[in-house]
From Swiss-Prot:
GO terms (BP aspect): protein ubiquitination; ubiquitin-dependent protein catabolic process
Lineage: Eukaryota, Viridiplantae, Streptophyta, Embryophyta, Tracheophyta
Function: Accepts the ubiquitin from the E1 complex and catalyzes its covalent attachment to other proteins.
Record InterPro entries: Ub_conjugating_enzyme, UBQ-conjugat_E2_core, UBQ-conjugating_AS, UBQ-conjugating_enzyme/RWD
Entry's family note: Belongs to the ubiquitin-conjugating enzyme family.
Protein name per UniProt: Ubiquitin-conjugating enzyme E2 3
Matching SMART domains: UBCc
Reaction catalyzed: S-ubiquitinyl-[E1 ubiquitin-activating enzyme]-L-cysteine + [E2 ubiquitin-conjugating enzyme]-L-cysteine = [E1 ubiquitin-activating enzyme]-L-cysteine + S-ubiquitinyl-[E2 ubiquitin-conjugating enzyme]-L-cysteine
Organism: Arabidopsis thaliana (Mouse-ear cress)
């Protein structure tokens, strides 16, 4: 039986295939529409440029009324990404709206890479370096980008 959540996710997947945002891809895992793998490519002309970052998205039957659980699988160094890969992003929490689809979620995460919020840190060291020593922060990001090739 196709539930409203599964119908919406099928629509999201078709839209993502038909009109993918630049630097983003995603698809259901093993033909399970409720679990997705995604890739975000680091935006050009940023320290993230050239990186390929893997994520997982897990949806419940409450989608789109509740946000997916999104985690980076790739190792990250970012003020708003926890050590376990979970992401501190308002639209994945208290600012969620059913109008957001998978493409909007992934685009927002891609934007967060370049525009972190150091006032809401998930990684205190990354937030401190971002605010106080941008050169060292960028060096650590470039290390992460190089590791993402593997």
């Amino acid at each position: 039986m196709t539930t409203p959540a599964k119908k919406r996710l099928m629509w999201d997947f078709k839209r993502l295939q038909k009109d993918p945002p630049v630097g983003i891809s995603g698809a259901p895992q093993d033909n399970n529409i409720m679990h997705w793998n995604a890739l975000i490519f680091g935006p050009e002309d940023t320290p993230w440029d050239g990186g390929t970052f893997k994520l997982t998205l897990h949806f419940t039957e409450d989608y789109p009324n509740k946000p997916p659980i999104v985690r980076f699988v790739s190792r990250m160094f970012h003020p708003n990404i926890y050590a376990d890969g979970s992401i501190c992003l308002d639209i994945l929490q208290n600012q969620w709206s059913p109008i957001y689809d998978v493409a909007a979620v992934l685009t927002s995460i891609q934007s967060l890479l370049c525009d972190p919020n150091p006032d809401s840190p998930a990684n205190a060291e990354a937030a401190r370096l971002f605010s106080e020593n941008k050169r060292e922060y960028n060096r650590k990001v470039i290390e992460i980008v190089e590791q993402s090739y593997v």
